[in-house]
Amino acid sequence: MEWTGAVYADAPTVEVSTWIDAPPERVWELASDIHAVAESSQELQRVEWADGDGPRLGARFTGYNRHPALGEWSTISEVVEFEPLTVFGWAVTDPANPTSSWRLSLAPEGSGTRLTQWMQLGPAPSGLSLAISATPDKEQKIVFVRLRELEAGMTATLDHLKQRAEH
């Protein structure tokens, strides 16, 4: 990731992508399973569905997180995009004004599937906002470091899903 000088109010984004040697049906089975997504995360420790046993538009889940600098916290997310074999997206805290938004999207590519994970910070304040408030002169660095952490975590998630889908 290259330095962009972004601040939190810019609602910066991160995107990672990988090609998986498996059909979209197999990749979707894993990408739409929030438990499988959490398995490889250093930060997202576990999830619990609040409204049933799986993803659907409007379903909610609680995510339990841990970060060495930010501590432990939980969030409630709502599924805001759900098109089988295509996209699974959720907004954290408030769908109308999320603290972050996440999306896993699939596209057939050759004999396999392109899986892309995207996320956006903000626009609503989050735990990161507290760190920025404490040292506002370092906001760009704080945002950049956080985006790099998220990029590394997302890459690990896609690598994990790829390995599971291909074996």
Where are these regions (language model features)?
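Beta-strand/loop substructures that line and gate deep hydrophobic ligand-binding cavities in soluble
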Residues: 94-152, 161
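Short hydrophobic/aromatic-rich motifs at helix boundaries and adjacent loops
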Residues: 6-9, 48-49, 74-76, 129-134
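Hydrophobic ligand-binding cavity/cleft-lining segments
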Residues: 1-57
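Short, mixed-charge, low-aromatic patches
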Residues: 18, 34-35, 58-61, 113-120
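Short amphipathic alpha-helical segments with heptad-repeat character
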Residues: 21-24, 28, 144, 148-151, ...
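Glycine-rich portal/gate segments that line the openings of hydrophobic small-molecule binding cavities
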Residues: 48-101, 109-114, 152-160, 164-167
